[in-house]
A protein has these predicted regions:
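Conserved donor-nucleotide/metal-binding helix-loop-beta segment in metal-dependent transferases, i.e.
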Residues: 133-160
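A conserved donor-nucleotide-binding helix/loop in the catalytic core
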Residues: 56-67, 94-124
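N-terminal anchoring/stem segment of glycosyltransferases
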Residues: 37-98, 220, 242-257, 261-270
Length: 276
């Protein structure tokens, strides 16, 4: 009989980790893995729909605030690509439409068709700033009705601005569909679902997708005042959770100074060439 050799290795269980892969291996088709070994990720993607020639000044600080305070999986740029900023992922396509809202609408189709974007995602503008950590279940925001908002614009100027006219159009189309007219068009992040957003914007041609989507899908919401500050003198409260600005108030106003002081450290997205 051949001689037998037996080798005994004394290995502490903790040292086994050095023999294991440090990152998940790719999943190969044909192998079944129990779902309990692959917990579903709850983080959702953040979408920024950007025009091609966007000034990145506000966006830089919006991204810093997102990285600091808004849990997410990936940040996507759709459409434009500002120099010096590198997102986690990008959808590059030719935006179509006669105004910025129609351009955004065309980009939303691309987002909803993209298999790599999470099923539920947050839509951000480049002038949205998350001032406090976001925790708990998300509920979208709204402020009154579209009729209220259009009447406010009309009181300020009977000749409605292009933006006000798009809100009026959204209200009329939603009424014709038998839907509500809640004003979801506030300057705050909004949660969308890829499947239902396509169905919603196909039913209504208004470019104001927030109110179209919210009313057609009857999205739950919290009613609150819009957070946009457009003047140069308003100083936000330290406890504010979200802020929004325009180019002038961000560059020259107290609100812009407040935001820049809150987020002095560069984000992971500021790693390209030509920033600033």
């Amino acid at each position: 009989m051949a001689n037998e050799f037996r080798i005994t290795l004394n290995i502490h269980p903790d040292s086994l980790t050095s023999f294991l892969p440090q990152s998940p291996a790719p999943i190969t088709r044909g192998f079944c893995i129990e779902e309990k070994t692959m917990p579903k990720r709850t983080e959702k993607d953040i979408i920024y729909i950007l025009k091609q020639d966007i000034d990145p000044f506000e966006l830089i600080y919006s991204l810093r605030s997102v990285e600091a305070n808004f849990p997410h999986r990936k940040v996507w740029f759709v459409g434009g690509q500002p120099r010096g900023l590198v997102p986690d992922a990008r959808i590059e396509h030719r935006q179509t439409g006669s105004n910025k809202w129609e351009l955004i609408r065309s980009s939303m189709y691309e987002v909803a068709r993209n298999e790599d974007v999470t099923s539920d995602f947050f839509l951000f503008n480049d002038d949205f700033f998350v001032m406090q950590p976001v925790k708990g279940k998300w509920i979208n925001f709204a402020s009154g009705t579209l009729t209220d908002r259009v009447n406010q614009f009309a009181a300020e100027n009977p000749w409605l601005s292009p933006y006000a006219r798009t809100l009026f159009k959204a209200r009329e189309e939603l009424k014709s569909l038998g839907c509500g007219e809640v004003n979801y068009d506030v300057h705050l992040p909004m949660l969308f679902n890829k499947d239902t957003v396509i169905q919603a914007i196909r039913q209504c041609s208004s470019p104001q997708m927030r109110s179209v989507y919210g009313n057609i899908t009857k999205s739950p919401y919290k009613d609150r005042k819009d957070v946009k500050i457009g003047d140069l003198t308003t100083i936000p409260l330290e406890s504010c959770d979200f802020l929004s600005t325009n180019e002038t108030s961000f560059k020259d106003g107290k609100v812009g100074e407040f935001i820049r002081e809150r987020f002095p450290a560069p984000s992971r997205f500021e790693r390209g060439e030509g920033l600033g």
